[in-house]
């Protein structure tokens, strides 16, 4: 099958996802359309086309025009090369993406969409109606867990038969381990973190749906956390609408409100005792699978597929519903019993079980089977 694989957001964890998946798709002629922030080596055996440049544009209207031009170029390629399948990873501008999907449908091209989330993280007025139209138009939808499959079918009134469950794999870093350890040691010294200290971390872009405000409220209100010299909170990554004022004055809190390099991301992950993932809503988290790669325990809320990896290996704690009380209870338990963190962190067999369950080879095989119409 000739496949156009399109990801306009192929940067950071999303570019690692693409690389890991495409390396394991066999028996198909894949053309990979990505953005200019793709961070990995060009994939051998595939055609690679850097068509998306909207990230470099300063204003919204110029970003939109740039994105439209990219989609027009892909449409022209589709007319010329006649792919059997178009596989879209993310939607950026709904009206443009929907018209593109209509054109592919009219051309008789099979359309597959990976729903990394059912709806955007920040939901606007017409999003549900728009996404419902898109979901009904496409031929197949990939989701990352059975729970999301059921939720999507019910919310959008579509048959579960067109929704296929294909896991999100463990995200392997291509940064040299020695460099990560060296940078983590530098950060540890800079932040005055002792090897025996407990470090809770929120990494990546910070938004309300990730539960960052829950973490802030808990730290601000609890002296067992905010006045403890052996416990630290790191919040690293660009924020959108997060109020850090309640925790600014605490000496054991470090906030870095900016994008960071892959090396620094891996280093902050490495020096963390536990990653906080009290998401309010999500289907699956790339950060969770980055933590698995480095054997860093996670605290996850029971939403989407976040708890599913814990069923394959004891790699962290399920806090249940993402409430202040539930998250605080678990954080305090770990502060009082740090041996629990070390027991999980040092049990490589449990992390290996999760890695095996979310193996990219089997994910690639399943995706290849879907392309062939066998799944």
Residue ranges and their predicted role:
Residues 5-6, 63-66, 75-95:
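Short N-terminal targeting/anchoring amphipathic segment
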Residues 7-69, 92-94, 148, 238-241:
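N-terminal strand-loop element at the rim of the active site
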Residues 139-181:
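Donor nucleotide-sugar binding/catalytic pocket of nucleotide-sugar-dependent glycosyltransferases
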Residues 193-210, 216-219, 233:
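Conserved donor-binding/catalytic core segment of Leloir-type glycosyltransferases
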Residues 243-267:
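Nucleotide-activated donor-binding/catalytic signature segment of Leloir-type glycosyltransferases, i.e.
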Residues 267-283, 296:
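Acidic donor-binding loop of glycosyltransferase active sites
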Residues 312-325, 333-339:
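Conserved acidic donor-binding segment of nucleotide-sugar-dependent glycosyltransferases
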Residues 339-372:
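A charged, aromatic-enriched C-terminal amphipathic alpha-helix characteristic of glycosyltransferases
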């Amino acid at each position: 099958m000739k496949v156009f694989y399109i990801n306009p957001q192929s940067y950071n964890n999303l570019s690692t996802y693409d690389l890991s998946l495409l390396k394991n798709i066999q028996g198909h002629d894949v053309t990979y359309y990505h953005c200019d922030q793709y961070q990995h080596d060009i994939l051998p055996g595939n055609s690679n086309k850097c068509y998306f440049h909207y990230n470099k544009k300063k204003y919204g209207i110029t970003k939109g025009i740039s994105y439209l031009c990219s989609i027009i170029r892909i449409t022209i390629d589709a007319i010329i090369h006649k792919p059997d399948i178009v596989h879209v990873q993310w939607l950026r501008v709904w009206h443009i993406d929907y018209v593109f999907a209509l054109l592919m449908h009219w051309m008789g091209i099979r359309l597959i969409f990976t729903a990394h989330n059912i709806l955007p993280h920040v939901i606007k007025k017409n999003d549900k109606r728009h996404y419902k139209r898109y979901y009904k138009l496409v031929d197949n939808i990939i989701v990352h867990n059975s729970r999301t499959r059921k939720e999507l079918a019910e919310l959008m009134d579509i048959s579960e038969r067109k929704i296929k469950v294909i896991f999100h794999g463990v995200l392997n870093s291509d940064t040299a381990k020695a460099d990560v350890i060296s940078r983590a040691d530098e950060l540890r010294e800079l932040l005055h973190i002792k090897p025996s200290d407990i470090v809770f971390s929120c990494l990546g872009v910070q938004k309300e749906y990730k539960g960052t405000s829950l973490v802030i409220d808990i730290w601000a209100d609890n002296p067992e956390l905010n006045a403890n010299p052996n416990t630290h909170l790191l919040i690293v990554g660009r924020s959108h609408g997060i109020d850090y004022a309640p925790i600014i004055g605490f000496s054991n809190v470090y906030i870095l409100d900016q994008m960071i390099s892959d090396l620094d991301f891996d280093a902050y992950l490495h020096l963390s005792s536990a990653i906080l993932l009290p998401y309010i809503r999500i289907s699956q988290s790339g950060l969770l699978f980055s933590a698995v790669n480095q054997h860093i325990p996670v605290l996850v809320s029971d939403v989407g597929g976040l708890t599913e990896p814990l069923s394959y290996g004891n790699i962290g704690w399920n806090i249940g519903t993402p409430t202040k009380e539930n998250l605080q209870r678990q954080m305090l338990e770990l502060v009082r019993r740090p041996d629990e963190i070390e027991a999980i962190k040092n049990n490589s067999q449990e992390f290996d079980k999760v890695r095996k369950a979310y193996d990219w080879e089997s994910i690639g095989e399943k995706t290849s089977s879907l392309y062939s119409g066998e799944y």
